[in-house]
Amino acid sequence: MLSSNGWRALVLSLALVPQAVADICATLEAGGIEIEKRISLAYQTDLTEYWSTACGDLKPTCIAAPSSAAEMAQVIKNLHDVETLFAIKSGGHNPNNGFASIQDGLLVSTKNLDQVDYNPEDHTAVIGPGLSWEEAQQGLAGTGRTIVGGRMGGVGVGGYMVGGGMSFLSSQYGWAANNVKDFEVVLANGSIVHATETENPDLFMSLKGGGNNFGVVTAYTMQTHPQDHKVWGGNYVYTADKASEILTAVRNFTDEYPDDKAAIIVTFERSLVIDLCILFLFYDGPEPPSGVFDEFTAIEHTSTTKTWDTYYDLLNHNNFFILKGQRYNIATETTPLPNKTVGTAPLEEYYEHFRDVTGSVLEVAGILGSIAFQPLPKTFSQRAKDRGGDLLDIPSDQPYIVIELNYSYGLSIDDSKVDAATVQLYQGMGNIVQKNIDKGLLPDVYRPLFMNDAYYRQDYWGRISPESKTLALKTRKAYDPEGFFQTRTSGGWRLKD
């Protein structure tokens, strides 16, 4: 089923003169910009690269692939001459229909914006939005440096960055967006500007968690960090009956956070034939010191952890867990961590709610449900503030867990059923959090949503602090006064008064 944004894209595109879209494809091609037409192999290949096959079901009239900021500016300027919607595609990992995909409009691919330019003098790297994170990391091979980026190598740079970006390195350096020194941006009027702490600082802050509301980012100048050593990581796999022990270990790990170089993701998966837990582990060194992961190690498991020669090797290994060829829905909730006295009761409620809702749709062909517990310890939030902050502005005096909810399944005929289950899952999760707050089991604190994991129906801007939303809205009006990106892009969380 198309999302509301996807239907909007489809209906408006069909309502407009189809020739207008064909005209802009021809205009851009005449201007020297790479254009992929529906009959081309490159076009077909691009549509198979989405994480969710539902996004690939949407067929743009053509795909434009600019290779520079100047060419991207040309695309944006030419779009003012026609009445058609467009979408921007980076890695295509966001599964929300219409966010990086479009029916009959113009799809703008950033795949040719794929530079990795390292500057050894200030240890920064210019990273293109068209890269995957494994490509970005591989581009730094031999420098002894790394960048704060995705935990799975196949995730794209572009959308990940403007959504904030959670990393295995976040407890050392904050969100990925906190490590950007300079955004190169094409604005709605086609001008190319830079956003830094001192140049267009309002735009600089708003791009760190503000999505696609302000312009098209064509390059990120990022601070790199030392990593001239091997890293350790991999997976532990547990049976589902160990859930209570695992969640206890998650709570304690997040609360005590024994080492800033350590990171985990705890993912429970359920289908008709699968019922288990996969723990992703990472340590920014050849081997974790004794005590860091001991509580997880003590639970019966199978292990594929090892020392990897490079961070790139680990990210490439993690790609095994990016299952393609399926349709995907994704959603999120943010919960404060229960204290030691309360224990894991709220976490176990979240897990049981996931099992209950998932159990109701197990007859859906090929369905696999997952719930991931992603620690957001106090040190993570403090590092984000130390590096200039962001729109999320999460307090550093309270540990949190970011919950990712996920359904993959096979057939479009089941779209409405899985959509309903997704809504039931995240709404119920939010209700459980609030119930525990009302009972005094969880603190009543600010709980923004993590954009990269959010479902299109969720109210991202309604959960951002009033101060951050006010800043973002002022920024949007200053840099896009006519609301070009609000009305002409086919998806994203709209920033309205």
Language-model features and meaning:
Residues 143, 147-183, 187:
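A gly/ser-rich beta-alpha-beta helix-loop segment of oxidoreductase catalytic cores
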Residues 65, 96-114, 169-188, 216-220, ...:
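Structural signature of FAD isoalloxazine-binding scaffolds in flavoprotein oxidoreductases
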Residues 1-23:
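Fungal secretory targeting signals
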Residues 51-55, 96-102, 208, 385, ...:
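Short glycine-biased active-site loop of nucleotidyltransferases that positions the nucleotide triphosphate
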Residues 40, 51-113, 129:
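Glycine-rich N-terminal segment of FAD-binding domains in flavoprotein oxidoreductases
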Residues 183-184, 188, 193-454:
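C-terminal cap/substrate-recognition region of VAO/PCMH-type FAD-linked oxidoreductases
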Residues 123-124, 131-138, 156-157, 310:
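Short, structural beta-strand-to-alpha-helix junction motif
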Residues 439-497:
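Activity-critical C-terminal alpha-helical subdomain
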